[in-house]
Amino acid sequence: AGNIIGTVALMPTKNKLVFELTKMAVKPEYRNKGIGKKLLKKCINYSKSNNHSSIILYSNKKLNNAIHLYRNFGFKEIKMEKKSPYLRANIKMVWIND
């Protein structure tokens, strides 16, 4: 008991109604057990209960499992800025609270 097996972080942006999913990871030996789903669901429920308008995230398209998970939770790909804030990011996604 008490072992950390995953992490997630939501960070406020300049727009107080928009949060960024800045970190989400699950230890390799605990993957494909629904932990990522639980972490992402917590973030979405937190955003809903605090009336946030949306969650944005940056990722890399080669992270197929992560992109698939985000899409399953309603995240949609949107246009990325010319200068990405993250060196390895090549996809930007948004979840809209409706």
Label every PLM stretch briefly.
Residues 18, 33-34, 87:
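Non-catalytic, surface-exposed connector residues within folded enzymatic/regulatory domains
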Residues 27-33, 61-62:
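Active-site acidic-Proline motif in GNAT/NAT acetyltransferases
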Residues 53-98:
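C-terminal "cap" of GNAT-fold acetyltransferases
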Residues 38-55, 69:
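Conserved acyl-CoA
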Residues 1-23, 27-29, 40-42, 46, ...:
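Acetyl-CoA-dependent GNAT
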Residues 16, 50, 58:
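Residue-level signal for short amphipathic helical patches enriched in basic/charged
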